[in-house]
Amino acid sequence: MAIGPKPESIIGSYDHPPQAEAQTEVKSAAINGDTSPVSRLKDFATDPWLTSTDQPQPDSTTNVPYSLPDSTQDARILIVGAGYGGLLFAVRLLQSGFTLEDILLVDSAGGFGGTWYWNRYPGLMCDIESYIYMPLLEETKNIPSQKYVSGEELRTHAERIAEKWKLGARTLFRTTVSDLTWDDNKMQWIATASFSSNEKKQGSCTYTINADFAILANGTLSKPKVPDLPGIDDYTGRIFHTARWDYDYTGGSPAIPAMDRLRTKKVGVIGTGSTAVQVIPQLARWAGELTVFQRTPGAVGLQENRETDHAWWRDNVQLAGPEWQRKRCENFNAFITNPYRASLEEEDLVKDGWTKHPSFSVALGGARNLQADFLDLAKKIDKERREIGQQHINSTVRNPATAEALFNPTYGWCKRPCFHQGYFETYNRENVRLVSTPGQGITKFTINGIMWGDKEFELDLIVLATGYDLGSLCPANRARLSIHGRGGLSMSQKWASGPATLHGVMTRGFPNLFFPGTSQAGVTANQSYMFDRAAEHIAYIIQNARPRTAASAVNLKVLVEPSLEAEELWAMETVSRARAFAATKTCSAGSYTISARLGESVDESQMARHMPWGEGMASYVKILEEWRKKGDMDGLEVVYD
């Protein structure tokens, strides 16, 4: 049983959001191949972007394999995931002194990019400024074409990183790790992996990977989630998820999404979150009729995109000097987590909807979140945000009833905000209609389309913009694999009473395993920055755990894990700051927050252990930097064999 402050003192309680609507909990199904409970969704688990067969491609950064894996693979460091996170871990390890041969990346996709590999729907773009989101811009000398670039450019950048550091030769694509088990005798992680040479042909093999260290760099936006509602198997039209877009049906391509085959089609979209906000305007341009089914309106702010001016880039970005990207990231973090904007002496470099939305620090944590007047100020700023948003909708959308339905009156920290240039204008088109189902969602699928209440909507195509299966907050469940540490203890068992970690990246009983996430760690809206700081920290730990004595000791096995005292102390430091997120308790079940994801079944003391670092990302990063500067690996036990 976890030890901590009395429950009522941990997180606290606040009033409910303005005009908050009760949401009906809609069961959902993760798309996971043959395990999907919905039979017609099983083909959603296949990779629609595979363009090659089984021919070796030794020089390619996508659609590898260069060869079928042997029955056993050996690696010093196994990285699960080859998106931006996995790439950052690989690069920071190389920069810390490891060799390419020390590293092995695996990913279920057929190429680099993670979420940017799987998602190629029309309208896909970054909603965080490209100059801070696209990692390693300094090292690759890449200049993004726009302030917010397309998904195609984001995926190409992942391939650029892989090519620069020659990571293609040390990556196994189409490879899914299902189990990680610690072998105390070998002092290694034994990974069970399955390799699908061509999912469309169902060619596959199973093998093991023996690794001294393992890093879970799986992203959260790659496993599609769909509503598990009656009738979905009865529907006779075409249906797919935005993360598995079918251009053969719609026409067009990821590069040129001219969906001319939809000219005469009746199209329905379920969802109005971040993905839907991007795809709906594109579908409206091409579909004969477009019906949008909305359960809860998104909080959509204006995104002012523009081409990158190279003279501006030279004068305002490059002249900022070494580490300009990190400085810009941290400037962004400062403005989105501090509603006391007058206290910030520096200039807002990013100047977008995010930095004008500092009340989101209620969900992220921040230096001022524990101050007595913080919540009152956050509410005041958020009220101004809602009023500006409502004015924009009312002045843009011509139909008053539609405008009212599109307005989200709840606090801006309950859901991740959306940003777009032209979303609300879409609802002025004659071929677009909004079906608002306040807090309920659709009733069921039918043979011909969708039923809401007693009205049926006939549709040729249903697009599921229903988000992604985030998994639970347990690292094993989040990575969708089974993890057993010392003595056969499962990660899920250890997490059941609330996590205990050192710095949010390691836990005792699971040596040499690293799992960057949100619990007991700093968070920000820019996930690339979070991965980069975790990669920097973990590379330091692994490098400094290696023996530095005689050359004969180089091949010694190393075991590194937190002490029981150190991880409990870090957990209590997190708990003591958990009330920074008190206002998130008022958010509904379908919200973005950790409180909503954990649900009412988790008591306050456990919930507090799951929270991020309450003082915000800057405080968290400073603590890690000071810990590394000391150089004594405080709180870690290191054993050689």
From Swiss-Prot:
Residues engaged in binding NADP(+): M125, C126, D127, T272, G273, S274, T275, A276, V277, Q278, R295, T296
Stretches with biased composition (Polar residues): 49-68
SUPFAM superfamilies: FAD/NAD(P)-binding domain
Documented EC number(s): 1.14.13.-
Pathway(s) of this molecule: Secondary metabolite biosynthesis; terpenoid biosynthesis
Site positions for Transition state stabilizer: R416
Cysteine-cysteine disulfides: none
GO molecular function, one term: monooxygenase activity
Record-listed FAD binding positions: T115, W116, Y117, W118, D127, I128, Y133
GO biological process: terpenoid biosynthetic process
The protein's required cofactors: FAD
Cofactor descriptive note: Binds 1 FAD per subunit.
Pfam families cross-referenced by the UniProt entry: Pyr_redox_2 (PF07992)
Protein's UniProt keywords contain NADP: yes
Region annotation Disordered: where it falls in the sequence: 1-68
Family: Belongs to the FAD-binding monooxygenase family.
Name listed for the protein in its UniProt record: FAD-binding monooxygenase ausB
Organism field: Penicillium brasilianum
Gene encoding the protein: ausB
